[in-house]
Amino acid sequence: SDVCSSDLPFVGLILAFLVMRLIVVIFRNKNPQKVGGGFRHAQSVSACAMAMGHGMQDAQKTMGVIFLLLISMGYASASDEMPVWIVFACAGAISIGTAVGGKRIMKTLGRGIIDLDPARGFSAESVSATVLYVTALGLDAPVSTTQVITGGILGAGVEKRVSSVRWGVGVNILWAWGLTLPAAAAIAALVYLIIKLVSGL
């Protein structure tokens, strides 16, 4: 695939901005309370779609790493089907991890970057879910769920006004993204060296 994952936050930002602008135009003269209540229900659907997209992207990456390990150890070949136990193990792990450790990240995304109202939450989630589905099913491209939804939230917030976005929080997120890859590589190398020393491989 020719998809560049670093571009996807900007894709999410632009699409969420456009979707939110369309929502504002359509519901401009409607009762704000009724509109908010309607989007609160709609957000239940968009949140479920987003959760499914999260599993389709992030769980599949973990499955791929485990399957690659099995191939390298001679327990499987590239032509084999993905073992069912890997699918269930990764699905369970990502579900438990999201439920147990995702609260702080959800708070940062839902309240830290902007104050999300139901309409903006729906816009960000629906756009992000669409991007995740298209990249996973149509382009076979692994992308970051967090990067896509962050771009969507920024786009929905910018549509209101640029000053409504807490850009300092966004900069902190960018720093975290930049540090993740080298930190993960360094830790993986360290673990490998320890295993090599202990096992004598």
Model segments located where?
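Short, small-residue-biased leader/transition segments that mark boundaries at the very start
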Residues: 2-5
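Catalytic phosphate/nucleotide-handling subdomain of diverse soluble enzymes
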Residues: 155-173
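Generic transmembrane alpha-helix signature in multi-pass membrane proteins
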Residues: 48-54, 60-68, 132-138, 144
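Transmembrane alpha-helical segments of multi-pass membrane transport proteins and ion-pumping complexes
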Residues: 9-21, 25, 59, 63, ...
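Hydrophobic alpha-helical bundle architecture
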Residues: 110-145, 173-178
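Transmembrane helical segments that form the transport core of multi-pass membrane transport proteins
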Residues: 57-124, 139, 156
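Intrinsically disordered, low-complexity non-transmembrane regions of multi-pass membrane transporters
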Residues: 19-50, 78, 105, 111, ...
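Hydrophobic alpha-helical segments embedded in the membrane of multi-pass proteins
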Residues: 41-44, 84, 88, 122-133, ...
